[in-house]
C-alpha cells in the first residue's frame, strides 16, 4: 500500500507525464484524464508551479465567459544528455546531444575519429554538463554489452572492458544509463509512434558485424546477460574478422536472419537498418516471398528497409532518459 507521500509523488509524476505527452491542459482536463480529484489536482498544480516543474500558459483557455488557466510542462526544468557511439559512413562517430523534456534539441555535435578514448569522452561530457547545468541524467548508447559493469563485445577497441557507467558517474556526479545501440534504435522506432508491440530490428553497419534489437509485447528483450540480439554469434559459419562487407554477402546474411527471426520471435514487423543499397522494393518482395514459401499458413511480418538508424537510435536513448526522470528516483545509485 502506497504511503501518502508516495501517492502524492506518484500523482505528480502522472500529471507531469500527461502534460508532456498531451500538451497544455486545464486543471479540470488534468483531473478528467488522470482520474485524480479536482481538489487534489489543485494542490499538486500549486506545488508543481512553485517548483517550476510546470508553467502557466500565457494564452489561457476561455470557458463560457470565464478564463480557465491551462498548464504545460516546463521543458527546460531538466535536460537529458544523450551520447551515442556509432559507425557512420565507415567512420567511428560520437554524437553528443542535449534534449529538453519535450525532446527538442538544445545542442547537437558529432565527432569522428579512431582515437576517441574514455579520457576524451569524459572531457566532452564534463564540458557539456558545465555548459548545461540543467542536465539531470546521461544516457549512453554503445555498440556492445555492459556485463558486470564493464563493456563487453565492443566494436570500438578503445572502450572494450571499460567501466563506462561507473567512470562517467564519478566524473560528473550524475546518473548514467548505458544501453545497447540496437535496443535503443528499436525503442526509437516504436516511439515514432507505431502500433506494433512485437518488433525486431536487424542492424547492418558497413564495417562491423550486425546486431539486433528485440521488442516483445512492448518491452525490450535483453536476456539474463543482455546478450539477446548478439546475432554475430549465430552458428551460420560466418568469419566476421574476414567478412567481405559486400552487398551480395550482406543480402545473403539478411535472408538467413529474416527466416531465423520469424522462427524465433514471430514479430509483427522486421526493420532492416542498413546504408547498403539493395533496391528496396524488389528486395523486400523477395524476402516476403521466401517467408511465404516457408510459412504459407502464417500472417507474415511487415518488412521495413530503413536508413534512419541514427535518428531512431537517438530517439530511443532519449526515451530511456525521459522514462528514468519521470520515475523520479531519489537515489539513482540504487
Where are these regions (language model features)?
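ATP-binding/phosphotransfer module of carbohydrate and carboxylate kinases, centering on a glycine-rich
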Residues: 1-58, 62-66, 70-107, 116-127, ...
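Short glycine-aspartate micro-motif
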Residues: 80-84, 137-139, 199-203, 211
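Short, acidic Gly/Pro/Ser/Thr-rich loop/turn segments
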Residues: 88-90, 145-147, 209-210
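Short, well-ordered strand-loop elements centered on a beta-strand within folded domains, enriched
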Residues: 94-96, 105-107, 151-153, 210-212, ...
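Hydrophobic beta-strand positions
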Residues: 98, 145, 213-214
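Glycine-rich phosphate-binding loop and adjoining helix at the ATP-binding site
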Residues: 105-110, 114-188, 284-293
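Short secondary-structure boundary segments
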Residues: 142, 202-206, 274-275, 303
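Glycine/GP-enriched mid-protein hinge/lid loop-to-helix segment characteristic of carbohydrate kinases
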Residues: 174-266
Amino acid at each position: 500500500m502506497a504511503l501518502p507521500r508516495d501517492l502524492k509523488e506518484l500523482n505528480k509524476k502522472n500529471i507531469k507525464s500527461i502534460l508532456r505527452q498531451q500538451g497544455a491542459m486545464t486543471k479540470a482536463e488534468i483531473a478528467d484524464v488522470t482520474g485524480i480529484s479536482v481538489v487534489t489536482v489543485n494542490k499538486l498544480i500549486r506545488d508543481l508551479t512553485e517548483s517550476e516543474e510546470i508553467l502557466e500558459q500565457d494564452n489561457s483557455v476561455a470557458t463560457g465567459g470565464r478564463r480557465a488557466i491551462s498548464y504545460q510542462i516546463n521543458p527546460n526544468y531538466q535536460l537529458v544528455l544523450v551520447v551515442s557511439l556509432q559507425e557512420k559512413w565507415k567512420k567511428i562517430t560520437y554524437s553528443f546531444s542535449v534534449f529538453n523534456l519535450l525532446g527538442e534539441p538544445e545542442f547537437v555535435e558529432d565527432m569522428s575519429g579512431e582515437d576517441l578514448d574514455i579520457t576524451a569522452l569524459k572531457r566532452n561530457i564534463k564540458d557539456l554538463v558545465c555548459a548545461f547545468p540543467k542536465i539531470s541524467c546521461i544516457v549512453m548508447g554503445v555498440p556492445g554489452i555492459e556485463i558486470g559493469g564493464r563493456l563487453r563485445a565492443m566494436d570500438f577497441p578503445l572502450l572494450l572492458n571499460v567501466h563506462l557507467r561507473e567512470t562517467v558517474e564519478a566524473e560528473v556526479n550524475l546518473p548514467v544509463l548505458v544501453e545497447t545501440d540496437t535496443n535503443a534504435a528499436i525503442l526509437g522506432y516504436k516511439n515514432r509512434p507505431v502500433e506494433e508491440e512485437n518488433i525486431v530490428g536487424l542492424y547492418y553497419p558497413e564495417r562491423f558485424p550486425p546486431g539486433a534489437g528485440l521488442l516483445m509485447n512492448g518491452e525490450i528483450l535483453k536476456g539474463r546477460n543482455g546478450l539477446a540480439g548478439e546475432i554475430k554469434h549465430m552458428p551460420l559459419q560466418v568469419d566476421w574478422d574476414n567478412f567481405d562487407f559486400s552487398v551480395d554477402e550482406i543480402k545473403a546474411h539478411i535472408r538467413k536472419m529474416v527466416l531465423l527471426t520469424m522462427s524465433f520471435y514471430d514479430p509483427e514487423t522486421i526493420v532492416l537498418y542498413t546504408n547498403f543499397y539493395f533496391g528496396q522494393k524488389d528486395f523486400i518482395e523477395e524476402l516476403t516471398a521466401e517467408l511465404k514459401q516457408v510459412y504459407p499458413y502464417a500472417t507474415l511480418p511487415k518488412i521495413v528497409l530503413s536508413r534512419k538508424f541514427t535518428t531512431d537510435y537517438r530517439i530511443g536513448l532519449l526515451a530511456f532518459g525521459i522514462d528514468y526522470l519521470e520515475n523520479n528516483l531519489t537515489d539513482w545509485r540504487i
